[in-house]
Amino acid sequence: MRTCIYIDGFNLYYGAVKGTPYKWLDFKATFAMLLQSHHQITAIKYFTAQVSGRRDPQQPVRQQTYWRALQASTPEFRLYKGTFLTHPVTWPLAQPLPGQRYATVLKTEEKGSDVNLAVHLLNDAWQDAYDCAVIVSNDSDLAEAMRLVRRHHPSKKLGLVFPRRETGGHPSRELSQHAHFVLRLGAGVLAACQLPVRIPGTTIHKPASW
């Protein structure tokens, strides 16, 4: 079964790998472990955005090192980048001060990843690029794209992998209702599916702080 993987990069990061030693994740090994053997992984599409490094100048360096590691080690890997937008917003204070009820702060938002993922999921269905699509996210904004695939391509299968390293927690009901199967990406799989510290045939190394 031709299977394409669609990864919501920031949902994966915040749901499963942030604060863990498992950031050097081998995507192909991960889905080979999670999925049954009849799945032939033909593409791994990763939707994310480049971090700014405003708070940590080395953060974009580590991120790009990881991207290069995946590109060098995984022929099926494809990278699709959205953007970060920072703009001032004015919000009410939770505990107003005398003469001050509002504060203006800088708000940073990631734009494009969920839309890009949804567009690729639908377009690939129309192009007959997969028999099964596996969505790695718990973002309910993707529900409509999944619903349309089910409606217009009833022979195609949809899987949902929700990133959750701890036991407990639940997949989005809006997403799971459109999935033929639902899997959890937990700490055991994360620990077992790390890239080599040095990518063979390259000079790419796992960042020391990871």
Predicted regions, residues:
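Domain-level signal for Mg2+-assisted phosphodiester chemistry and nucleotide/NA-binding surfaces
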Residues: 1-108, 161-167
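Nuclease catalytic cores that cleave nucleic-acid phosphodiester bonds
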Residues: 81-210
